Amino acid sequence: MLTKAYIPYRGYYSTPFSRWQGAMANEHAIVLAAETSKRFLMERKWDAGMFDYLILGMTIGQPQWFYGSPWAAAMIGAVSIPGMLISQACNTSATCIFQAGVGVETGLYQNVYALMTDRCSNGPHTVW
């Protein structure tokens, strides 16, 4: 189905599932993901300016998540790119990868960054 889109060799990383209670209780998932991504890019000497779009995947709402994608992009160093948030319960990461691939395949994007993060072990608790 996709002939132009691919994930380059060494162009990916994954972190272990985190327990958000205890030492990580006050961490913000988007900030943690963006800081980790920035280190990932720096270790490979890759410039975040190469990306033209950022797809943020996140299911559990947190403060600032409404504008989470451009915020995360700015934190990794891609300050002028747009983005979107995808929240698709139990399928968020797969949907992000698919949307990134389709965007490249159709020419909508040249080089899209898919960043998925969450606080799943804490469970959703939203107070209005």
Predicted features by range, described:
Residues 58-111:
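Conserved catalytic cysteine-centered active-site region
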Residues 1-81, 117-128:
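Conserved "HGTGT" condensation-loop signature of ketosynthase/thiolase-family condensing enzymes
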